[in-house]
């Protein structure tokens, strides 16, 4: 058993609350246990300069953590004047993951920006952000459809993400902070609804992992992601 009495291959309690804030075209509070991320999707009826005149849209993401989302307060990155490498890496990952679920041609010359703000962190903030942001993105695209700004639904399929790791030679799904801090290996896995991989980020901390262990982690991750996609579908009323 684990710290919170979960089974090795069990997700934390996952909640996806839509329409969490008033103004954004898509707004989701996603909770993976004690990790809570606010994901808001905003529409801009233009595209970045490098896409002008190409008849396609763009999806991008920003990520940040509130100063006291962790055990001790951290300065706001805006106050420091620059983003950390970690923040830049995570927001690029979120953007790549979300673009995989959209036909950018069908999006027209519109940009959807997803802001992922961590309000409480207990491990898995990037995977929770991707899972919640996917729902917020769908809500924003539905606004474009309802307002007849686009003619066809750009959605290709859902996307979700989860962490897996090896602790004391056991594969664990959906790591909390303490598990993540002490595991031998951890992976972040992003997959499509169709079971295709978008990203696999893996690092051995204490000792290298074998191909057999890698396969075992991916199997557990795939199981968890399929469960998350069902939760996304329930939240969307599908």
Curated annotation (Swiss-Prot):
Keywords: Nucleotidyltransferase, RNA-binding, rRNA processing, Transferase, tRNA processing, tRNA-binding. This is Ribonuclease PH. Homohexameric ring arranged as a trimer of dimers. GO terms for biological process: rRNA catabolic process; rRNA processing; tRNA processing. The gene is rph. GO terms for molecular function: 3'-5'-RNA exonuclease activity; tRNA binding; tRNA nucleotidyltransferase activity. Its EC number is 2.7.7.56. Pfam families: RNase_PH, RNase_PH_C.
């Amino acid at each position: 058993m684990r710290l919170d009495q979960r089974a090795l291959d069990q997700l934390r309690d996952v909640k996806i609350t839509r329409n969490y804030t008033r103004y954004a075209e898509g707004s989701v509070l996603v909770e993976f246990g004690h990790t809570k991320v606010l994901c808001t999707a905003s529409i801009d009826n233009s595209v970045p300069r490098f896409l002008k005149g190409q008849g396609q849209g763009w999806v991008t993401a920003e990520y940040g953590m509130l100063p006291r989302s962790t055990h001790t307060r951290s300065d706001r990155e805006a106050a420091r004047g620059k983003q950390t490498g970690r923040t830049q890496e995570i927001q690029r990952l979120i953007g790549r993951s979300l673009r995989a679920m959209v036909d950018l041609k069908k999006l027209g010359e519109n940009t959807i920006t997803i802001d992922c703000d961590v309000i409480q962190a207990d491990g898995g903030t990037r995977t929770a952000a991707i899972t919640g942001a996917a729902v917020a993105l769908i809500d924003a695209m539905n606004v474009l459809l309802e307002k007849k700004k686009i003619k066809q639904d750009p959605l290709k399929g859902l996307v979700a993400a989860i962490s897996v790791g090896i602790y004391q030679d056991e594969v664990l799904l959906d790591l909390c902070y303490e598990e993540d801090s002490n595991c031998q290996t951890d992976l972040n896995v992003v997959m499509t609804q169709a079971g295709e991989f978008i990203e696999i980020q893996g690092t051995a901390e204490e000792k290298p992992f074998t191909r057999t262990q890698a396969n075992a982690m991916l199997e557990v991750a795939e199981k968890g992601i399929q469960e998350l996609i069902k939760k996304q579908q329930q939240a969307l009323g599908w």
